C-alpha cells in the first residue's frame, strides 16, 4: 500500500486541475475565441505546433480537427524548418502553443507563416510574450499551478491547453453544423463506431 502522503497528493491533483478549469472561464474572451473559431472553420488546412507537453497536446488537437473533417496535422518544430511548413498555404491557420509564449523553437514557424499569409493563433499564459504579440489571435491559457509539489511538471498546464482545444472543437461543431452521421462514416471502429452506425441511434 502506498503512503497516505502519496494518496493525499493524488487527491489534491484532482482539486488543483478542477479549480483550474473552473477559473479558466474568467479569462474567456468572446472576441478572441470567435475570431479563432472563424479562422479555423474557414481554413483549408490547419497546423499545430508546440514543444514538450504542449506539442503532445497539439497532436491531440490535430486529431480532434480530423474527427470533424477539418484537415489538420501536428508540425514538429524540428521538421517545420526542414520543409514541414510546406503543408500550409495562404489562408490556412497555424496554432502555436507555448505556456510562456517565448518558445524559441516556434519563432521560425511564426516567421514562415507570416511570410506565407498563414494566420497564427497563439495559445499562451503570457499575453505580452513574443508569440502573443505577433499572432493574429491570442487565446489565454490560465494555470493556477501544476499538480506536483514542486510546481514543475506539465500537468495542469496541459489540461488547460486541452480544455481550450476541446472548447474550440465544440464551437466548430456548432458553427459548421457537423452531423453525427458524418462522423459515423469516418469512425466505424470501436464502441463509438458501433454506436454511431447502429440503426435507430
Give residue ranges: language-model regions.
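Internal, active-site/partner-interface "lid" segment
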Residues: 133, 147, 173-201
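Residue-level preference for alpha-helix termini and adjacent loops
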Residues: 20, 27, 32, 80, ...
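Glycine-rich phosphate-binding loops that contact phosphosugars or nucleotide phosphates
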Residues: 45-176
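An N-terminal, well-structured beta->alpha segment
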Residues: 2-42
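Alpha-helix boundary/capping residues
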Residues: 40-43, 95, 190
